[in-house]
Amino acid sequence: MMNKASGRSFTRSSKYLLATLIAGMMASGVSAAELVSDKALESAPTVGWASQNGFTTGGAAATSDNIYIVTNISEFTSALSAGAEAKIIQIKGTIDISGGTPYTDFADQKARSQINIPANTTVIGLGTDAKFINGSLIIDGTDGTNNVIIRNVYIQTPIDVEPHYEKGDGWNAEWDAMNITNGAHHVWIDHVTISDGNFTDDMYTTKDGETYVQHDGALDIKRGSDYVTISNSLIDQHDKTMLIGHNDTNSAQDKGKLHVTLFNNVFNRVTERAPRVRYGSIHSFNNVFKGDAKDPVYRYQYSFGIGTSGSVLSEGNSFTIANLSASKACKVVKKFNGSIFSDNGSVLNGSAVDLSGCGFSAYTSKIPYIYDVQPMTTELAQSITDNAGSGKL
């Protein structure tokens, strides 16, 4: 049963009014409950791009009739039907986006697996086991969607049931775990875990002599989206991690947009794109990157990919990459037609690293918000790791 949680004290104390309200809610199949945690009312922190040129409050202004507890996909989509009204949706347990019915082909998966999150919404997991499987959360600005908060949930990356074949590039999957697209803006992602989970890349089969790839991105931000903060989150066991700006020719939509802050996140056993950026301006500080250049499944390739007109300011990050020597430190940043990258105060395998000689021009844009980069130490890296991801809010 989907519960519409009150989350507010009543303005009148009349027992009669309270009894009438509860009776009406029970008659409609919805029972009254309390807002489980005031953390659902929190706005994005002032640190990060989501605080700029406006605010990111999600569903904090929700009235009592737009606060929900949901336990399955039917209840979740019903709660989302409130549209742009402020709403808080509390996730209890596992939401199987497929509803337990396997996808039959590309068209079926496209129709049922992509869940659009409307404006003025907070989605927050309850406890330590809130989870989405077999689908994607989409924040799509086509209809003006903005002001969205996603917190304390685990998302298992979707498995494409019918990948498409591209000559020269092999089999490619379509679906991301999360996608912020088409001009969506003011989005805060916090204490979220995204992982390949129980279907890792070594479980791929082959088809027509080539690897049958069934995972795409973990969290992509593209097509003119803007003012995004990602904090205290974990991306674990994945290849194509985070694409910011989807291609080199989309300057009309992307130029001057795609401002993204990443802080206090952990990227564990991710192969690449943490992130790869075109056109965007990325601030990445006090994040932890863990990998192995000889990992048999998720072989570390690079963290920051600098694409066309993209720029990254990296500060106080920790790179613990097995089988990557200090002499090859520049492998943490890769040039893809881009030229702007700076790093200050980061460490590689426990020692200070100098990335100034990696062939990039300095990042000179002003960061408009006040922030505090903590000196990266082994203890800080462990603290960030211990705090990152779902179930730790």
Curated annotation (Swiss-Prot):
Residues spanning the signal sequence: 1-32
Keywords tagged on the record: Calcium, Disulfide bond, Lyase, Metal-binding, Repeat, Secreted, Signal
Cofactor: record remark: Binds 1 Ca(2+) ion per subunit.
Localization annotation: Secreted
Pathway the protein acts in: Glycan metabolism; pectin degradation; 2-dehydro-3-deoxy-D-gluconate from pectin: step 2/5
Disulfide pattern: 330-358
One Pfam family recorded for the sequence: Pectate_lyase_4
Any one cellular-component term (Gene Ontology): extracellular region
Residues where Ca(2+) binds: 174, 176, 216, 220
GO MF annotations, alphabetized: metal ion binding; pectate lyase activity
GO terms under biological process: pectin catabolic process
Needed cofactors: Ca(2+)
Domain of life: Bacteria
General function of this protein: Involved in maceration and soft-rotting of plant tissue.
Protein name: Pectate lyase A
Species in which this protein is naturally found: Dickeya chrysanthemi (Pectobacterium chrysanthemi)
